[in-house]
C-alpha cells in the first residue's frame, strides 16, 4: 500500500516523536526538481516536511522504499526491513544523516512509531492436529494403511489447487529463482553454514554445486509463466492432520508467489528421506517401502490434478536444495552416514541434471543400479 501523507496525521506523529507541538507548513516530494538528474531511478521515495515548532523551524524527510518490481522490494515485509535497517544503520555511520524514528502507517492512515522495537513477533491461531512427520515416523516400523495413501493424495491435490492461482510477473518469478540460489536460507546460505572443512562436502564440491545452481537459475528464468501461489516451506513439520484427510498448515514463508516445484519438492523429498532412513536401518541403501510408493503416489497425483507436464523440467534444483538441507549436520546431526551420503548424491546428481526422471529416484538416493 502506498504511503499517503496527511498533514494532520503527520503533525500528530511528529509531535509524539519530537516531544513538542508540531505544525506542518509544507510538504513536497524530493527529487522532483527541473534540474536534469542522470540518475533516472532510485529505491527511495522521499518527502521533505517543513515544520514549525516552538523551538524554531525544522526541515525533516520522510522516506519509504519504492515497491518496484524486480529489486527484492515486492512485499511490505521487504520494505519494512529497509526502514528498520536504515534506522539502525544510519546512526552508526560517521557524517550520515541521522535517523530520528522508524514507523508504519495503519490502514486508517495513522502513523505509528516503531523506533523502540527490539524484536518482532507474530500472533497466530493455534492449529489443532498431529504433525504429519509423526505419520511418517510411524511408518518406519509399521505397515501402511489406506489412510496413508489417501493423505499423500490429499496433500498433492491441495497443492495442485493452490498452484492453479497464477500471476503474470516475470520479475517476481526471477526473484524467487534467484533466492533459491543466493538467499541465506537457501543454497548458498546452507553451504556457507556447513562446518568447513567438512569431508562430505569439501569446498571444491560446494563450488561445483553453486555453479550448477546458477546454471539452473538462468534456465528457469524463461519459465516465468509458471509463477503461482505457493506455500514456500511445505514439509511434514508444517502440516497437521486431524481426522481422515482434514489438515491445516503452518509457517508459510519465502514469499507468496513462486515456482510450484518448490512446494512439491519440500514434501516429496521427505518421503525419500524417511525411506532412506528406513533402508539404512536395515543395512541397505536407497529408498525403502512404503515411502518409495508414497513418493510416487504423491507425485503422480499432483501431475494428474495440476496437468503440470513441465514439473519434471523444473523439479531438480528444488529437490537438490531440500536434499542439502536434510544432509546438513546442524539440522540433522544423527543421520546414518549412508543416509547423509545418499542425500548428497541426490543433490549433486540433480543439480547437474537437465530433468527429473521419477524412475531414477532410488538410484539417485544411493541404491545400486
Regions inferred by a protein language model and the residue ranges of each:
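A glycine-centered beta->alpha junction motif in the catalytic cores
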Residues: 66-68, 121, 125-144, 164-167, ...
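Conserved ATP-binding subdomain of kinase catalytic cores across diverse folds
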Residues: 34-35, 44-45, 50-182
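Active-site acidic catalytic loop and adjacent metal/ATP-binding pocket
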Residues: 36-57, 61-62, 162, 214-264
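Charge-rich, low-complexity intrinsically disordered segments
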Residues: 341-369
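Juxta-kinase regulatory segment immediately upstream of eukaryotic protein kinase catalytic domains
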Residues: 1-35
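Active-site activation/catalytic loop segments of kinase-like enzymes and analogous catalytic loops
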Residues: 261-306, 320-338
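All-alpha amphipathic helical-bundle segments outside canonical DNA-binding/catalytic cores
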Residues: 150, 175, 307-319
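Active-site catalytic-loop/activation-segment of kinase and kinase-like phosphoryl-transfer enzymes
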Residues: 1, 120, 125-127, 172-219, ...
Amino acid at each position: 500500500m502506498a504511503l499517503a501523507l496527511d498533514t494532520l496525521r503527520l503533525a500528530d506523529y511528529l509531535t509524539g516523536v519530537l516531544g513538542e507541538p508540531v505544525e506542518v507548513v509544507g510538504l513536497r516530494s524530493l527529487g522532483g526538481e527541473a534540474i536534469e538528474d542522470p540518475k533516472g531511478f532510485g529505491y527511495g521515495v522521499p518527502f521533505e516536511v517543513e515544520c514549525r515548532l516552538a523551538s524554531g523551524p525544522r526541515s525533516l524527510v520522510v522516506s519509504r522504499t519504492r515497491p518496484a518490481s524486480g529489486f527484492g522490494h515486492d512485499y511490505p515485509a521487504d520494505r519494512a526491513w529497509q526502514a528498520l535497517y536504515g534506522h539502525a544503520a544510519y546512526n552508526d555511520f560517521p557524517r550520515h544523516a541521522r535517523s530520528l524514528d522508524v514507523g508504519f502507517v495503519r490502514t486508517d492512515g495513522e502513523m505509528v512509531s516503531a523506533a523502540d522495537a527490539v524484536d518482532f513477533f507474530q500472533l497466530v491461531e493455534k492449529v489443532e492436529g498431529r504433525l504429519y512427520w509423526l505419520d511418517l515416523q510411524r511408518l518406519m516400523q509399521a505397515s501402511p494403511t489406506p489412510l496413508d495413501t489417501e493423505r499423500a493424495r490429499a496433500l498433492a491435490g491441495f497443492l495442485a489447487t493452490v498452484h492453479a492461482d497464477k500471476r503474470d510477473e516475470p520479475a517476481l518469478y526471477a526473484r524467487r529463482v534467484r533466492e533459491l540460489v543466493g538467499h541465506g536460507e537457501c543454497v548458498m546460505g546452507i553451504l556457507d553454514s556447513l562446518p568447513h572443512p567438512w569431508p562430505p562436502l569439501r569446498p571444491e564440491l560446494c563450488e561445483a554445486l553453486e555453479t550448477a545452481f546458477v546454471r539452473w537459475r538462468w534456465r528457469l528464468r524463461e519459465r516465468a509463466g509458471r509463477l503461482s501461489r505457493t506455500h514456500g516451506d511445505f514439509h511434514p513439520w508444517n502440516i497437521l492432520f486431524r481426522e481422515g484427510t482434514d489438515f491445516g498448515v503452518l509457517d508459510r514463508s519465502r514469499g507468496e508467489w513462486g515456482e510450484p516445484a518448490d512446494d512439491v519438492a519440500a514434501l516429496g523429498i521427505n518421503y525419500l528421506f524417511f525411506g532412506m532412513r528406513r533402508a539404512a536401518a536395515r543395512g541397505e541403501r536407497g529408498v525403502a517401502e512404503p515411502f518409495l510408493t508414497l513418493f510416487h503416489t504423491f507425485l503422480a497425483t499432483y501431475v494428474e490434478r495440476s496437468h503440470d507436464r513441465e514439473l519434471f523440467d523444473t523439479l531438480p534444483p528444488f529437490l537438490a536444495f531440500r536434499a542439502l538441507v536434510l544432509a546438513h549436520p546442524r539440522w540433522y546431526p544423527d543421520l546414518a552416514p549412508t543416509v547423509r551420503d545418499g542425500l548428497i548424491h541426490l543433490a549433486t546428481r540433480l543439480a547437474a541434471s537437465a530433468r527429473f526422471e521419477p524412475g531414477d529416484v532410488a538410484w539417485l538416493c544411493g541404491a545400486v543400479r
